[in-house]
């Protein structure tokens, strides 16, 4: 039995206007913040890397974002829900680089419960401060009633999710789960695996990529010569070739920032995460002598590159430039000239070859200077005409 005041409150609540935008905001909050626990990243099971994703509800973004991956939830509250057939959902899931859709099952007139919940919340807010004791009791009862209604709505929406249909990348994958969180995780993992078609180029991931970067940058000369020649899975040959091809074009004329390289390969179709996987490839090409690393107008050497390549905040300070390297035939000819001059075969690696040439030429120059000095003057005097005459006369 309701009192007159309770009946009046009920009528006033029913008269409260609720817009479609308010309904959508509530559903988005219930689905994304409570049922899916505010999740904004998915951990790829195979690579253990994290991927951010956008959240959409009925075609509108929730908490604006601009990532490669998008998870959209279609609900009966949406104006186009009835029009979204399997064919249209499949087509919509093919939009953008990586999109997945969960279309909720249409069960139990959830829209009426959502509207009633919002009407009560909207009615109670401005009434509390000025309410009489009797009205305050009525409002508290309605607040308790709404708390229970919210719990029922969460259960109902969760059931509608697991009973719904899923679509991704223009397909309708066979993904079913008992819980909404598991459903979303399975669907997003499917999205990662099929959006990033070159994710598998990195076959082997370092257990400690930072330690691996340091090891590469401080490798000895023998190890350096083998760093970029890896053709096995352990050397991630496909990923290394992909990086080499990109830098051969992008960094041949202009310098490219390391931060831009990392951002590029984190996106589709590569999806290389974390950033250290990309930096490790750059470090290998650098130590193999294929690229130069420049910071503050100074060329970096291996040990000098350790600090900026192991701190993400420094990536914007490091520029990459493709080095001009000689082919095998040219290097072999230079090695043979060195052998003829100095009776020893120098290293094949370009930097080591140049360094050996300079060292031995410097030693030869010093030896000749000592020889001319021993003959009675500086080496410059040996070429003066009078020096040659004196030497010839003395010989007679």
Predicted regions and their residues:
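Extended alpha-helical interface modules used as scaffolds for assembling large macromolecular complexes
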Residues: 1-375, 380-396
């Amino acid at each position: 039995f309701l009192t007159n005041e309770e009946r009046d409150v009920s009528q006033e609540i029913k008269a409260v206007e609720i817009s479609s935008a308010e309904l959508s905001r509530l559903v988005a909050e219930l689905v994304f913040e409570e049922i899916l626990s505010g999740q904004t990243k998915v951990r790829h099971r195979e690579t253990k890397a994290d991927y951010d994703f956008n959240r959409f509800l009925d075609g509108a973004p929730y908490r604006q974002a601009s990532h490669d991956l998008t998870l959209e939830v279609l609900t009966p509250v949406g104006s186009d829900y009835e029009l979204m057939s399997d064919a249209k959902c499949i087509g919509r899931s093919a939009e953008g680089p990586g999109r997945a859709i969960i279309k909720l099952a249409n069960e139990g007139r959830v829209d009426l419960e959502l509207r009633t919940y919002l009407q009560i919340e909207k009615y109670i807010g401005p009434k509390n401060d000025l309410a009489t004791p009797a009205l305050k009791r009525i409002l508290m009862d309605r607040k308790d009633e709404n708390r229970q209604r919210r719990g029922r709505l969460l259960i109902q929406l969760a059931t509608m999710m697991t009973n719904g249909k899923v679509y991704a990348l223009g397909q309708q994958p066979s993904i079913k789960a008992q819980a909404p969180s598991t459903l979303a995780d399975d669907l997003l993992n499917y999205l990662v695996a099929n959006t990033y078609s070159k994710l598998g180029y990195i076959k082997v991931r370092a257990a400690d990529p930072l330690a691996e970067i340091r090891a590469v940058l401080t490798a000895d000369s023998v190890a350096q010569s083998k760093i970029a020649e890896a053709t096995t899975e352990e050397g991630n040959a496909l990923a290394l070739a992909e990086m080499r091809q990109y830098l051969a074009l992008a960094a041949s004329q202009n310098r490219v920032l390391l931060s831009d390289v990392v951002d590029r390969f984190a996106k589709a179709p590569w999806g290389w995460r974390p950033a250290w996987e990309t930096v490790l490839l750059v470090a290998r090409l650098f130590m193999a002598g294929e690229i130069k690393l420049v910071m503050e107008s100074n060329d970096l050497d291996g040990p000098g590159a350790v600090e900026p390549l192991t701190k993400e905040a420094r990536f914007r300070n490091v520029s990459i430039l493709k080095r001009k390297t000689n082919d095998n035939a040219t290097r072999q000819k230079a090695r043979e000239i060195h052998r003829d001059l100095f009776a020893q075969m120098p290293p094949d690696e370009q930097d080591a070859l140049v360094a050996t040439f300079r060292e031995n030429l410097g030693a030869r120059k010093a030896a000749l200077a000592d020889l001319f000095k021993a003959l009675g003057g500086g080496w410059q005097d040996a070429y003066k005409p009078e020096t040659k005459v004196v030497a010839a006369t003395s010989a007679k």
